[in-house]
Protein backbone atom coordinates (compact mmCIF):
# COMPACT_ATOMS: atom_id res chain seq x y z
CA UNK A 1 0.00 0.00 0.00
CA UNK A 2 1.38 3.39 -1.03
CA UNK A 3 0.23 6.44 0.93
CA UNK A 4 1.09 9.81 -0.64
CA UNK A 5 0.71 13.16 1.03
CA UNK A 6 0.16 16.51 -0.67
CA UNK A 7 3.12 18.81 -1.36
CA UNK A 8 3.63 21.77 1.00
CA UNK A 9 1.16 20.38 3.53
CA UNK A 10 2.07 18.82 6.90
CA UNK A 11 1.57 15.27 5.59
CA UNK A 12 3.56 15.86 2.37
CA UNK A 13 5.59 13.05 0.84
CA UNK A 14 9.07 14.49 0.23
CA UNK A 15 11.58 13.31 -2.38
CA UNK A 16 15.12 14.69 -2.41
CA UNK A 17 17.10 14.48 -5.66
CA UNK A 18 20.87 14.31 -5.23
CA UNK A 19 21.87 15.64 -8.62
CA UNK A 20 19.56 17.99 -10.48
CA UNK A 21 20.49 17.52 -14.14
CA UNK A 22 18.21 16.67 -17.06
CA UNK A 23 17.51 13.14 -15.80
CA UNK A 24 16.67 14.43 -12.35
CA UNK A 25 14.41 17.02 -13.94
CA UNK A 26 12.27 14.32 -15.53
CA UNK A 27 12.15 12.40 -12.23
CA UNK A 28 11.03 15.62 -10.51
CA UNK A 29 8.27 16.12 -13.09
CA UNK A 30 7.01 12.57 -12.52
CA UNK A 31 6.97 13.22 -8.76
CA UNK A 32 5.10 16.48 -9.31
CA UNK A 33 2.42 14.55 -11.22
CA UNK A 34 1.75 12.63 -8.01
CA UNK A 35 1.64 15.71 -5.80
CA UNK A 36 4.98 14.90 -4.18
CA UNK A 37 7.13 17.63 -2.62
CA UNK A 38 10.46 17.78 -4.46
CA UNK A 39 13.78 19.08 -3.14
CA UNK A 40 16.61 19.30 -5.68
CA UNK A 41 20.28 19.33 -4.64
CA UNK A 42 23.31 19.92 -6.85
CA UNK A 43 26.77 21.47 -6.80
CA UNK A 44 25.71 24.49 -8.90
CA UNK A 45 22.68 26.82 -8.81
CA UNK A 46 19.80 26.81 -11.28
CA UNK A 47 20.36 23.21 -12.36
CA UNK A 48 17.54 21.80 -14.55
CA UNK A 49 15.63 19.91 -11.85
CA UNK A 50 15.72 22.97 -9.61
CA UNK A 51 13.38 24.67 -12.11
CA UNK A 52 10.62 22.17 -11.29
CA UNK A 53 11.34 21.54 -7.60
CA UNK A 54 9.67 23.14 -4.59
CA UNK A 55 13.04 23.94 -3.03
CA UNK A 56 16.70 23.57 -3.92
CA UNK A 57 20.11 23.53 -2.26
CA UNK A 58 23.64 23.97 -3.59
CA UNK A 59 26.26 21.86 -1.81
CA UNK A 60 29.30 19.71 -2.47
CA UNK A 61 27.67 16.28 -2.38
CA UNK A 62 31.03 14.60 -1.77
CA UNK A 63 31.11 16.41 1.58
CA UNK A 64 29.43 13.96 3.95
CA UNK A 65 28.82 16.59 6.61
CA UNK A 66 27.13 18.97 4.16
CA UNK A 67 25.06 16.11 2.76
CA UNK A 68 23.92 14.99 6.20
CA UNK A 69 23.05 18.59 7.13
CA UNK A 70 20.75 19.19 4.14
CA UNK A 71 19.05 15.80 4.57
CA UNK A 72 18.51 16.43 8.28
CA UNK A 73 17.09 19.87 7.47
CA UNK A 74 14.66 18.68 4.78
CA UNK A 75 13.72 15.27 6.25
CA UNK A 76 12.93 13.58 2.90
CA UNK A 77 11.02 10.31 2.80
CA UNK A 78 13.01 9.22 -0.27
CA UNK A 79 16.59 10.14 -1.20
CA UNK A 80 17.09 9.68 -4.95
CA UNK A 81 20.69 9.92 -6.26
CA UNK A 82 20.99 11.03 -9.88
CA UNK A 83 24.80 11.10 -10.12
CA UNK A 84 27.79 9.08 -8.89
CA UNK A 85 29.71 11.87 -7.13
CA UNK A 86 28.04 11.57 -3.73
CA UNK A 87 29.35 10.76 -0.24
CA UNK A 88 27.95 7.23 -0.32
CA UNK A 89 29.38 6.32 3.09
CA UNK A 90 27.08 8.98 4.52
CA UNK A 91 24.14 7.55 2.58
CA UNK A 92 24.81 4.12 4.12
CA UNK A 93 24.90 5.67 7.58
CA UNK A 94 21.63 7.50 6.95
CA UNK A 95 20.01 4.34 5.62
CA UNK A 96 21.11 2.49 8.76
CA UNK A 97 19.39 5.27 10.71
CA UNK A 98 16.13 4.58 8.89
CA UNK A 99 16.18 6.79 5.79
CA UNK A 100 15.07 5.41 2.42
CA UNK A 101 17.85 5.64 -0.20
CA UNK A 102 16.79 4.73 -3.77
CA UNK A 103 17.21 1.98 -4.76
CA UNK A 104 19.38 1.33 -1.69
CA UNK A 105 22.62 2.72 -0.30
CA UNK A 106 24.56 -0.43 -1.19
CA UNK A 107 23.63 -0.13 -4.86
CA UNK A 108 24.61 3.53 -4.89
CA UNK A 109 27.94 2.77 -3.23
CA UNK A 110 28.84 -0.20 -5.42
CA UNK A 111 28.04 1.62 -8.67
CA UNK A 112 29.60 4.97 -7.77
CA UNK A 113 32.87 3.59 -9.08
CA UNK A 114 33.67 1.05 -11.75
CA UNK A 115 35.67 -1.16 -9.40
CA UNK A 116 32.80 -2.00 -7.08
CA UNK A 117 30.38 -3.00 -9.81
CA UNK A 118 32.98 -4.82 -11.93
CA UNK A 119 34.08 -6.96 -9.00
CA UNK A 120 30.45 -7.73 -8.15
CA UNK A 121 29.60 -8.72 -11.73
CA UNK A 122 32.73 -10.66 -12.65
CA UNK A 123 34.00 -12.05 -9.36
CA UNK A 124 30.85 -12.54 -7.27
CA UNK A 125 28.17 -13.19 -9.91
CA UNK A 126 30.46 -14.80 -12.49
CA UNK A 127 29.06 -12.76 -15.38
CA UNK A 128 30.96 -12.40 -18.66
CA UNK A 129 32.91 -9.10 -18.82
CA UNK A 130 35.91 -7.70 -20.65
CA UNK A 131 39.35 -8.44 -19.22
CA UNK A 132 40.37 -5.78 -16.72
CA UNK A 133 42.94 -4.59 -14.22
CA UNK A 134 42.92 -1.74 -11.70
CA UNK A 135 45.77 0.67 -11.03
CA UNK A 136 46.40 3.47 -8.55
CA UNK A 137 49.82 4.68 -9.68
CA UNK A 138 51.48 5.32 -13.02
CA UNK A 139 53.76 2.31 -12.52
CA UNK A 140 50.87 -0.05 -11.73
CA UNK A 141 48.99 1.47 -14.68
CA UNK A 142 51.82 0.39 -17.00
CA UNK A 143 51.68 -3.09 -15.46
CA UNK A 144 47.91 -3.23 -15.96
CA UNK A 145 48.21 -2.28 -19.63
CA UNK A 146 50.90 -4.92 -20.11
CA UNK A 147 48.60 -7.54 -18.58
CA UNK A 148 45.53 -6.55 -20.62
CA UNK A 149 47.39 -5.82 -23.87
CA UNK A 150 46.82 -3.41 -26.76
CA UNK A 151 44.40 -2.04 -27.72
CA UNK A 152 42.78 -1.20 -24.41
CA UNK A 153 40.71 1.48 -22.72
CA UNK A 154 41.56 3.37 -19.54
CA UNK A 155 38.92 5.12 -17.44
CA UNK A 156 38.89 6.70 -13.98
CA UNK A 157 37.01 4.36 -11.66
CA UNK A 158 34.71 7.29 -10.94
CA UNK A 159 33.72 9.46 -13.90
CA UNK A 160 30.89 9.99 -16.36
CA UNK A 161 30.21 11.18 -19.93
CA UNK A 162 33.57 9.92 -21.17
CA UNK A 163 35.61 12.22 -18.94
CA UNK A 164 39.14 10.92 -18.44
CA UNK A 165 38.63 8.02 -20.86
CA UNK A 166 41.23 7.10 -23.51
CA UNK A 167 41.56 4.42 -26.18
CA UNK A 168 45.17 3.20 -26.12
CA UNK A 169 46.74 1.60 -29.19
CA UNK A 170 50.44 1.81 -28.31
CA UNK A 171 52.92 2.48 -25.50
CA UNK A 172 53.51 6.00 -26.82
CA UNK A 173 50.04 7.00 -25.57
CA UNK A 174 50.46 5.79 -21.99
CA UNK A 175 51.76 8.97 -20.35
CA UNK A 176 49.08 11.14 -21.92
CA UNK A 177 46.32 8.63 -21.12
CA UNK A 178 47.38 8.41 -17.47
CA UNK A 179 47.42 12.20 -17.11
CA UNK A 180 44.02 12.55 -18.80
CA UNK A 181 42.52 9.89 -16.52
CA UNK A 182 43.84 11.70 -13.46
CA UNK A 183 42.21 14.93 -14.62
CA UNK A 184 38.86 13.31 -15.47
CA UNK A 185 37.84 11.61 -12.23
CA UNK A 186 34.71 12.95 -10.54
CA UNK A 187 36.42 12.95 -7.14
CA UNK A 188 39.82 14.07 -8.43
CA UNK A 189 42.93 12.06 -9.25
CA UNK A 190 43.07 8.42 -8.27
CA UNK A 191 42.44 4.82 -9.27
CA UNK A 192 41.73 3.74 -12.86
CA UNK A 193 40.44 0.67 -14.65
CA UNK A 194 42.19 -0.71 -17.73
CA UNK A 195 39.83 -2.76 -19.91
CA UNK A 196 40.48 -5.02 -22.85
CA UNK A 197 38.63 -4.16 -26.05
CA UNK A 198 35.56 -6.31 -26.57
CA UNK A 199 34.52 -7.47 -30.02
CA UNK A 200 30.84 -6.62 -30.38
CA UNK A 201 28.18 -5.96 -32.99
CA UNK A 202 26.39 -3.29 -30.97
CA UNK A 203 25.84 -1.95 -27.46
CA UNK A 204 22.52 -1.83 -25.65
CA UNK A 205 21.08 -0.37 -22.51
CA UNK A 206 18.58 -2.76 -20.97
CA UNK A 207 16.36 -0.61 -18.76
CA UNK A 208 15.45 -2.98 -15.94
CA UNK A 209 12.91 -2.27 -13.20
CA UNK A 210 12.97 -3.98 -9.82
CA UNK A 211 9.56 -3.45 -8.20
CA UNK A 212 7.14 -4.95 -5.71
CA UNK A 213 5.69 -7.11 -8.49
CA UNK A 214 9.02 -8.45 -9.71
CA UNK A 215 11.64 -7.57 -12.31
CA UNK A 216 10.50 -5.96 -15.57
CA UNK A 217 12.37 -5.14 -18.78
CA UNK A 218 11.93 -2.38 -21.32
CA UNK A 219 12.64 -3.23 -24.95
CA UNK A 220 16.42 -2.99 -25.53
CA UNK A 221 17.77 0.47 -26.32
CA UNK A 222 20.54 0.72 -28.92
CA UNK A 223 22.87 3.69 -28.96
CA UNK A 224 25.85 5.29 -30.66
CA UNK A 225 28.71 6.62 -28.56
CA UNK A 226 31.24 9.28 -29.50
CA UNK A 227 33.97 10.68 -27.23
CA UNK A 228 32.58 8.57 -24.38
CA UNK A 229 29.09 10.05 -24.50
CA UNK A 230 25.95 9.04 -26.33
CA UNK A 231 24.85 10.85 -29.49
CA UNK A 232 21.76 8.89 -30.56
CA UNK A 233 19.70 6.13 -29.01
CA UNK A 234 16.86 4.08 -30.43
CA UNK A 235 14.29 1.52 -29.36
CA UNK A 236 13.81 -1.32 -30.00
CA UNK A 237 17.28 -2.58 -30.89
CA UNK A 238 16.88 -5.73 -32.96
CA UNK A 239 18.68 -8.78 -31.56
CA UNK A 240 18.26 -12.53 -31.52
CA UNK A 241 15.84 -14.13 -29.08
CA UNK A 242 18.74 -15.97 -27.45
CA UNK A 243 20.79 -12.79 -27.03
CA UNK A 244 17.79 -10.98 -25.55
CA UNK A 245 17.18 -13.85 -23.12
CA UNK A 246 20.82 -13.79 -22.04
CA UNK A 247 20.75 -10.01 -21.67
CA UNK A 248 17.69 -10.22 -19.45
CA UNK A 249 19.27 -12.97 -17.34
CA UNK A 250 22.40 -10.86 -16.77
CA UNK A 251 20.35 -7.77 -15.95
CA UNK A 252 18.14 -9.70 -13.55
CA UNK A 253 21.18 -11.10 -11.69
CA UNK A 254 22.76 -7.65 -11.40
CA UNK A 255 19.72 -5.71 -10.16
CA UNK A 256 18.73 -8.39 -7.65
CA UNK A 257 22.30 -8.50 -6.34
CA UNK A 258 22.34 -4.72 -5.94
CA UNK A 259 18.96 -4.72 -4.21
CA UNK A 260 16.21 -2.19 -3.68
CA UNK A 261 13.40 -0.93 -5.89
CA UNK A 262 13.88 1.36 -8.87
CA UNK A 263 14.98 1.45 -12.49
CA UNK A 264 18.50 0.38 -13.45
CA UNK A 265 20.31 1.11 -16.71
CA UNK A 266 22.23 -2.09 -17.50
CA UNK A 267 24.82 -1.59 -20.27
CA UNK A 268 25.73 -4.64 -22.34
CA UNK A 269 27.81 -5.58 -25.39
CA UNK A 270 26.18 -7.93 -27.90
CA UNK A 271 28.06 -10.04 -30.43
CA UNK A 272 25.78 -12.46 -32.23
CA UNK A 273 24.09 -14.49 -29.50
CA UNK A 274 26.78 -13.64 -26.94
CA UNK A 275 26.22 -10.91 -24.32
CA UNK A 276 28.90 -9.27 -22.16
CA UNK A 277 28.22 -7.11 -19.12
CA UNK A 278 29.66 -3.57 -19.23
CA UNK A 279 28.25 -1.27 -16.53
CA UNK A 280 25.08 -0.48 -14.59
CA UNK A 281 23.55 2.71 -13.21
CA UNK A 282 20.99 2.36 -10.37
CA UNK A 283 18.90 5.16 -11.86
CA UNK A 284 17.51 6.34 -15.21
CA UNK A 285 20.06 6.32 -18.03
CA UNK A 286 20.76 9.08 -20.53
CA UNK A 287 20.27 6.72 -23.50
CA UNK A 288 16.83 5.94 -22.05
CA UNK A 289 15.56 9.44 -22.82
CA UNK A 290 14.12 7.85 -25.96
CA UNK A 291 11.43 6.33 -23.69
CA UNK A 292 9.92 9.82 -23.34
CA UNK A 293 8.38 9.15 -26.75
CA UNK A 294 8.64 5.36 -27.18
CA UNK A 295 6.76 3.98 -24.16
CA UNK A 296 3.55 4.55 -22.21
CA UNK A 297 5.70 4.79 -19.07
CA UNK A 298 9.05 6.52 -19.54
CA UNK A 299 12.10 5.31 -17.64
CA UNK A 300 11.51 8.21 -15.24
CA UNK A 301 7.89 7.25 -14.56
CA UNK A 302 8.99 3.65 -14.03
CA UNK A 303 11.69 4.70 -11.58
CA UNK A 304 9.27 6.76 -9.50
CA UNK A 305 6.56 4.11 -9.55
CA UNK A 306 9.04 1.45 -8.45
CA UNK A 307 10.67 3.33 -5.58
CA UNK A 308 7.27 4.43 -4.26
CA UNK A 309 6.34 0.76 -3.92
CA UNK A 310 3.78 0.66 -6.73
CA UNK A 311 3.41 -2.30 -9.12
CA UNK A 312 4.62 -1.88 -12.70
CA UNK A 313 2.25 -4.33 -14.36
CA UNK A 314 3.20 -4.14 -18.03
CA UNK A 315 5.32 -1.73 -20.08
CA UNK A 316 3.90 -0.80 -23.47
CA UNK A 317 6.37 0.05 -26.24
CA UNK A 318 4.80 2.06 -29.05
CA UNK A 319 7.18 1.13 -31.89
CA UNK A 320 10.35 2.45 -33.54
CA UNK A 321 11.62 5.64 -31.90
CA UNK A 322 14.90 7.49 -31.42
CA UNK A 323 16.61 10.32 -29.58
CA UNK A 324 19.43 12.60 -30.75
CA UNK A 325 21.29 15.00 -28.49
CA UNK A 326 21.54 18.75 -28.98
CA UNK A 327 25.24 19.23 -28.27
CA UNK A 328 26.53 22.73 -29.08
CA UNK A 329 30.00 24.14 -28.49
CA UNK A 330 30.20 27.72 -27.20
CA UNK A 331 30.65 29.82 -24.08
CA UNK A 332 27.63 31.62 -22.65
CA UNK A 333 25.65 32.29 -19.49
CA UNK A 334 22.64 33.41 -21.51
CA UNK A 335 21.88 30.59 -23.93
CA UNK A 336 19.04 30.91 -26.45
CA UNK A 337 17.57 28.39 -28.89
CA UNK A 338 16.49 29.53 -32.35
CA UNK A 339 14.56 27.69 -35.07
CA UNK A 340 12.89 25.32 -32.60
CA UNK A 341 9.75 25.64 -34.73
CA UNK A 342 11.64 24.01 -37.60
CA UNK A 343 12.62 21.04 -35.45
CA UNK A 344 9.23 19.92 -34.15
CA UNK A 345 6.40 18.28 -36.08
CA UNK A 346 4.22 15.19 -36.25
CA UNK A 347 6.02 12.47 -34.32
CA UNK A 348 8.94 14.77 -33.48
CA UNK A 349 9.48 16.50 -30.13
CA UNK A 350 12.25 18.58 -28.55
CA UNK A 351 13.28 18.75 -24.90
CA UNK A 352 15.47 21.68 -23.79
CA UNK A 353 17.03 21.10 -20.40
CA UNK A 354 17.40 24.67 -19.15
CA UNK A 355 21.06 24.40 -18.13
CA UNK A 356 22.19 27.83 -16.92
CA UNK A 357 25.46 28.06 -18.84
CA UNK A 358 27.85 26.41 -21.25
CA UNK A 359 31.64 26.59 -21.50
CA UNK A 360 32.77 24.32 -24.31
CA UNK A 361 30.67 21.35 -25.41
CA UNK A 362 27.61 20.50 -23.33
CA UNK A 363 24.39 18.54 -23.85
CA UNK A 364 21.61 21.12 -23.68
CA UNK A 365 18.68 19.21 -25.10
CA UNK A 366 17.43 16.20 -26.99
CA UNK A 367 15.24 15.61 -30.04
CA UNK A 368 12.80 12.69 -29.98
CA UNK A 369 11.20 11.08 -33.01
CA UNK A 370 9.14 8.11 -34.12
CA UNK A 371 9.36 6.41 -37.51
CA UNK A 372 8.26 3.50 -39.66
CA UNK A 373 11.47 1.79 -38.58
CA UNK A 374 14.40 2.54 -36.29
CA UNK A 375 16.58 3.87 -39.11
CA UNK A 376 13.94 6.42 -40.10
CA UNK A 377 13.40 7.43 -36.48
CA UNK A 378 17.13 8.07 -36.01
CA UNK A 379 17.29 10.17 -39.18
CA UNK A 380 14.29 12.23 -38.08
CA UNK A 381 15.69 12.76 -34.58
CA UNK A 382 19.12 13.80 -35.89
CA UNK A 383 17.55 16.17 -38.40
CA UNK A 384 15.43 17.77 -35.69
CA UNK A 385 18.42 18.19 -33.38
CA UNK A 386 20.47 19.78 -36.17
CA UNK A 387 17.74 22.33 -36.88
CA UNK A 388 17.94 23.84 -33.40
CA UNK A 389 20.38 26.76 -33.46
CA UNK A 390 22.02 27.41 -30.09
CA UNK A 391 23.26 30.94 -29.48
CA UNK A 392 24.97 32.68 -26.57
Swiss-Prot record:
Residues annotated as binding ATP: 114, 155, 160-165, 195-198, 203
Q: What is its EC number?
A: 6.3.1.21
Q: Name one GO cellular component term.
A: cytosol
Which processes are annotated in GO (biological process)?
'de novo' IMP biosynthetic process
Residue sites binding N(1)-(5-phospho-beta-D-ribosyl)glycinamide per the record: 22-23, 82, 286, 355, 362-363
Its UniProt pathway annotation is:
Purine metabolism; IMP biosynthesis via de novo pathway; N(2)-formyl-N(1)-(5-phospho-D-ribosyl)glycinamide from N(1)-(5-phospho-D-ribosyl)glycinamide (formate route): step 1/1
Q: What's its job? A: Involved in the de novo purine biosynthesis. Catalyzes the transfer of formate to 5-phospho-ribosyl-glycinamide (GAR), producing 5-phospho-ribosyl-N-formylglycinamide (FGAR). Formate is provided by PurU via hydrolysis of 10-formyl-tetrahydrofolate.
Q: How does it assemble?
A: Homodimer.
Would you tell me the protein name for this molecule?
A: Formate-dependent phosphoribosylglycinamide formyltransferase
Taxonomic lineage per UniProt?
Answer: Bacteria, Pseudomonadati, Pseudomonadota, Gammaproteobacteria, Enterobacterales
Amino acid sequence: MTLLGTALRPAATRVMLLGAGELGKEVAIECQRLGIEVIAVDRYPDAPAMHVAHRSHVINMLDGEALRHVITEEKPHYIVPEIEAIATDTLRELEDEGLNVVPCARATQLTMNREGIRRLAAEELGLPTSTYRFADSEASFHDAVAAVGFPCIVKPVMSSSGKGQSFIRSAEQLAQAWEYAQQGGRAGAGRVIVEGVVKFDFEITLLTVSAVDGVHFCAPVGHRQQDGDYRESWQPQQMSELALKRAQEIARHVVLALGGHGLFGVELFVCGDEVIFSEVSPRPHDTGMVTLISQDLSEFALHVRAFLGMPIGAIRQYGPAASAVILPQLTSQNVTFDDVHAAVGAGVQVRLFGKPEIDGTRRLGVALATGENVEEAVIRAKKAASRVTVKG
